[in-house]
Amino acid sequence: MKYQLAIIGGGPAGYTAAEMAGKAGLSVVLFEKNNVGGVCLNEGCIPTKTLLYAAKVHDTALHASKYGVNVKEVSADLGKIIARKTKVVRKLVLGIKAKLTAQKVTLVQGEAYIQDAHTVRCGEELYECEQMIVCTGSATFIPPVAGLDSVNYWTHRDALDNKEIPSSLVIVGGGVIGMEFASFFHSLGVKVTVVEMMDEILGGMDKELSGLLRADYVKRGVKFLLNTKVTGVTQKEDGIEIEYTCGEEKNTVCAEKLLMSVGRRPVMSGFGLENLNLELTARGTVKVDEHLQSSVPGVYVCGDLNGVSLLAHTAVREAEVAVHHILGKTDAMSYRAIPGVVYTNPEIASVGCTEEALTREGRVYRVVSLPAAYSGRFVAENEGVNGVCKVLVGEDEEILGVHLLGNPASELIIQAGMMIEDRRKLSEWKKYVFPHPTVGEIFREL
């Protein structure tokens, strides 16, 4: 079987590329060994946001009296929350399959193996292709911890399918995944402890705002162990005992459940990638150019596999750029304004440079910061809740970075990223008319 384009991996990069190329008239074959949609749709972005929304509804009901609404009884049915999550995922997976079918994409459900730059094997079948996009994503990284193999610990996948609310939970890793699950389970009344090796949670976000978010959760009862390394775990009758060190101090913490969420690593083995002899970066990921083309002409690498930005929305844009290059259209990938969002309650979002990055690079900047209370809409909808809008501005008044704490940061960060991508100056925000009242009006107040 011969195709103009073969795509390995049906996650955000893979299905985006397949749909685009099919729509452009190319014959496309897409290989996916699990469910189309990848980790993001099936066990990542969408499932977690479905759970987090349920937790937010639960929080709203619990604290409804602040807004003059009396709710007598509030309880969470985790089984029903998980069932709804499954329904949402199934609906979106079917939607993607329908779009692929509409563009005449051949979807092969099975493990693909790359034999060379123009040949892919799946089972007993061989598929020839003129060009190839490889986007196999990433997998959960589990660090070597003494005793870990002997305890019934969770990964994010287990946490997403668990139907019983534990009494207590220790989360190893205070990154995006760890903090989102901390937010979810804390909202359901679970006693949560977060263990983080670094001196602050959410390493890639603005340090000041990350600290404010952590302080908010501390007030609500979440415990954080920073600068802390887990050295061993032991299964006990009533749960799991976690041994840890903080400096010279050794201690233990016990919980009913343990969630390991220290990060993810690109999937680079098991599908014949080595047969392509691709050039790698110093970090061991696949090296690509601004068109996402690897060192082998006609072979493109998108998403987590190239290691540049392990985010679903980055993968989607990379796929668009790769397909445009295949079609002979002018386009190039820019990582200048890739937004990052952590969907805790409240949300925290970031785009562009952080203060830490600018300081490392020796760049001159100033900070323009306002409390979210400058927005009437924010005050109306957030009783007793604080938020921050922080903008980093260069010597020429160009916007270098925007960092937000407070709902709905995930929606506001979009326009901030557009300003950074287009190299706009801070004063240019005042040229736009914002609907009133909206939280986004705060940008005009800067």
Predicted feature residues:
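Beta1/beta-strand and adjacent pyrophosphate-binding region of the FAD-binding site
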Residues: 1-13, 165-175
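Gly/Ala-rich phosphate-binding loop of Rossmann-like dinucleotide-binding domains
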Residues: 18, 22, 182, 186-187
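Glycine-rich flavin
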Residues: 2-3, 19-26, 31-165, 193, ...
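FAD-site-proximal beta/loop scaffold in flavoenzymes
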Residues: 149-165, 253-327
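Core beta-strand elements of the Rossmann-like FAD/NAD(P) dinucleotide-binding domain
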Residues: 1-3, 123-131, 248-257, 295
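Short glycine-/small-residue-rich Rossmann-like dinucleotide-binding loops
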Residues: 11, 32, 137-138, 246, ...
